Amino acid sequence: MNTEIIVLFIIHFIMINENVFIALLHYPAMDKDGKIIVTSFTTMDLHDIARPARAYEINKYYIVQPIDAQRIVIQRQINYWLSEEGRKANPTRYEIVQLVRLAYTLDEVIEDIEKERGRRPLLVGTDARTYPNTVKYSWLRNEIQKRDRDWLIVFGTGHGIPPDLMNTFDYILEPIYGAGDWNHLSVRNAVAIILDRLFSRNRCD
């Protein structure tokens, strides 16, 4: 058994929150006028979301990007960091990128999770607005800790996830409230904050 296979084996079986997955949607997304668009991938989307995903021991992190030219860029980066050269250059990045998967659509993500886990995950949307099915962090944390269901937490890009898609989710997580009214955070900020609120060992309840 080679070293890479051993590392993958260890990471898979020590993940505390193996029933939790996250997805970053580059499509569908909205522009400032509410028009449906495809947003562009940035390198920070890969590294700065994979890091908290690993720190809070999430099962997998999916990047949803349907544009082939963008997918080539993403896959090239993934392949490099999973190569022997990438592992030697940055072992930590080699480890976190093992959590990353690339998908064309959100449906593909759901199907992949179903194939691995044998059941459909409950979908949790994230937004700066509230919806009739908005839930609190404490509620979601308690439900996740029961370990009897799988959860897919979906993060938007651009100006957010379109309402038509949000309305199909099982739950919507309450917005991130800071010290005041300003909450225009990057998606990378939002992912880190939300995962910390749900899974940190030293969170303030």
From Swiss-Prot:
InterPro entries named in the record: Alpha/beta_knot_MTases (IPR029028), RNA_MeTrfase_C_dom (IPR019230), tRNA_m1G_MTases_N (IPR029026)
UniProt KW keywords: Membrane, Transmembrane, Transmembrane helix
Taxonomy, superkingdom: Bacteria
Record-given protein name: Uncharacterized protein aq_054
Gene3D superfamilies linked to this entry: 3.40.1280.10
Lineage: Bacteria, Pseudomonadati, Aquificota, Aquificia, Aquificales
Cellular compartment(s): Membrane
Keyword Lyase: no
Entry membrane topology: Single-pass membrane protein
GO CC, any one term: membrane
Transmembrane segments: 5-27
Family note: To T.maritima TM1570.
Main localization, broad class: membrane
